[in-house]
Amino acid sequence: MALTKAEMSEYLFEKLGLSKRDAKELVELFFEEVRRALENGEQVKLSGFGNFDLRDKNQRPGRNPKTGEDIPITARRVVTFRPGQKLKSRVENATPKED
């Protein structure tokens, strides 16, 4: 199972007493700010959670898996995430819930 933005909004609604509309808007604004920062080439550091970084990948040779033909894979910018030590520790020590 995956955590969705809708579930995050519902959690904020229940825990903070926000209206459903405000909870949804808060989640959307958070992710929009992360997107905006990354689009502007900024690193996003969330203390106790992790860092979102941009990495430029160079063009490299690739292969079409169907035909075996050599093709170039174009240079591109990708988003990477590096979890912080607190998040790593909590995940390592967590017991997954059964569905």
Curated annotation (Swiss-Prot):
GO BP terms, alphabetized: DNA recombination; positive regulation of metabolic process; regulation of DNA-templated transcription; regulation of translation
Keyword annotations of the record: DNA recombination, DNA-binding, Transcription, Transcription regulation, Translation regulation
A UniProt-annotated Pfam family: Bac_DNA_binding
GO molecular function term, any single one: DNA binding
Record carries keyword Kinase: no
SUPFAM superfamilies the record matches: IHF-like DNA-binding proteins
Disulfide bonds: none
GO cellular component terms attached to this protein's record: cytosol
Region described as Disordered: 49-71
Function: This protein is one of the two subunits of integration host factor, a specific DNA-binding protein that functions in genetic recombination as well as in transcriptional and translational control.
Family to which this protein belongs: Belongs to the bacterial histone-like protein family.
SUBUNIT field: Heterodimer of an alpha and a beta chain.
Name by which UniProt lists this protein: Integration host factor subunit alpha
Organism: Erwinia tasmaniensis (strain DSM 17950 / CFBP 7177 / CIP 109463 / NCPPB 4357 / Et1/99)
Species classification: Bacteria, Pseudomonadati, Pseudomonadota, Gammaproteobacteria, Enterobacterales
